[in-house]
Amino acid sequence: MADTGTEKLVIIAAGGTGGHMFPARAFADEMRARGWNTALISDSRGLRYAADFPADWKEEIEAASPNFRKPWTVPGAALKINAGIARARRLMKQHRPALVAGFGGYPAFPALAAARRLGVPIIIHEQNAVLGRVNRQFAKHAQLVASGFERLDRLPRGSAHMVIGNPVRAPIIAAGQVPFPPTDGTLNIFITGGSQGSRIIGEIVPLAIANHVAPPLRVRLKVVQQVREEQFESVSNLYRSAGIECELAAFFGDMPERLAAAHLVIARSGAGTVSELATVGRPSILIPLAIAMDDHQAANAEALTAIGAADMILETNATPKLLGELISARLSDGADLTARAAAAKSAARPDAAQKLAEMAERIAEL
């Protein structure tokens, strides 16, 4: 049912967090550079990340994630999902896409279901090292399942699978050209909790640095940290009382520059974060989100820990003392830091968006 016009359309279906939206955006940028029209289907949460998403049109549809532990909520969720599928079908009949690209998250379900029913080719991109629930349901029906990491758990047998990496934004790729900073002066620590912030990182990391890094090293530190607004005052007071230069914000709009300036990054291990660390080439300490579905953040972290580019501390083990000792060990050895940066860079896949776009075009032409 592809459009017979000169410009083909790809509809992008993505969930309601930055982890799904950012790679979808990088893919959309690449497809538009190749002359394609792009459209975005998501729910209200997803569209909050899409103010400047490169799309000819964007559509908010009904979506839900049924909670079978609360069976009384399932009928309402089913009604929302069916309404979303019906709306997605109408849109596809109207706009006649050549392809639907799913980037995971439950808001992607209605568009993928509609595409399957209408016979529109489907490609799926899985950012994490564990295939998500929505992508899992459509993997065997997709012409391609592209993955962000070599490891991809829970992939159904018979699925067409290819490792391409996670598409990252052009400014991140540009930051990857910045050399690792010298380690004989100020040491920059960049601390981020991902697109939704992290209360635990905001509590534990400042205590680790202020109380468990020795003064001779502590005076050389500059800390740049993403914190929630309600934590701003307490974190600021803690750093300043310990004599540590700090810069705090709820969100950093210049993330590529912050990563490039860092000697050490402390972060969650969402797929986007891990891929950006590799692209820029910076050593890290990763604290996976314990409640992540299928423990996928711990699986993601292994892409860097296995090659000596990162350390991983599970939330259950993340005490200020342990973290402070690890920070001290890493920052005290400049040669080791530099080697870890090079190891991270070796895992980079800066051409992921191009590879995914190439496969999308091939599949659309079949």
UniProtKB/Swiss-Prot annotation:
InterPro entries linked: GlcNAc_MurG (IPR006009), Glyco_trans_28_C (IPR007235), GlycoTrans_28_N (IPR004276)
Catalysed reaction, written as an equation: di-trans,octa-cis-undecaprenyl diphospho-N-acetyl-alpha-D-muramoyl-L-alanyl-D-glutamyl-meso-2,6-diaminopimeloyl-D-alanyl-D-alanine + UDP-N-acetyl-alpha-D-glucosamine = di-trans,octa-cis-undecaprenyl diphospho-[N-acetyl-alpha-D-glucosaminyl-(1->4)]-N-acetyl-alpha-D-muramoyl-L-alanyl-D-glutamyl-meso-2,6-diaminopimeloyl-D-alanyl-D-alanine + UDP + H(+)
Keywords tagged on the record: Cell cycle, Cell division, Cell inner membrane, Cell membrane, Cell shape, Cell wall biogenesis/degradation, Glycosyltransferase, Membrane, Peptidoglycan synthesis, Transferase
The way it spans or sits in the membrane comes to: Peripheral membrane protein
Its UniProt pathway annotation is: Cell wall biogenesis; peptidoglycan biosynthesis
Where found, per UniProt?
Cell inner membrane
Residue sites binding UDP-N-acetyl-alpha-D-glucosamine per the record:
17-19, 128, 169, 195, 297
Please list the GO terms describing molecular function: UDP-N-acetyl-D-glucosamine:N-acetylmuramoyl-L-alanyl-D-glutamyl-meso-2,6-diaminopimelyl-D-alanyl-D-alanine-diphosphoundecaprenol 4-beta-N-acetylglucosaminlytransferase activity; undecaprenyldiphospho-muramoylpentapeptide beta-N-acetylglucosaminyltransferase activity
GO biological process: one example: carbohydrate metabolic process
Q: What's a single GO CC term here?
A: plasma membrane
Give the main localization category: membrane
Enzyme Commission number(s) from the entry: 2.4.1.227
Q: What is the documented function of this protein?
A: Cell wall formation. Catalyzes the transfer of a GlcNAc subunit on undecaprenyl-pyrophosphoryl-MurNAc-pentapeptide (lipid intermediate I) to form undecaprenyl-pyrophosphoryl-MurNAc-(pentapeptide)GlcNAc (lipid intermediate II).
Q: Tell me the protein family, please.
A: Belongs to the glycosyltransferase 28 family. MurG subfamily.
Record-given protein name: UDP-N-acetylglucosamine--N-acetylmuramyl-(pentapeptide) pyrophosphoryl-undecaprenol N-acetylglucosamine transferase
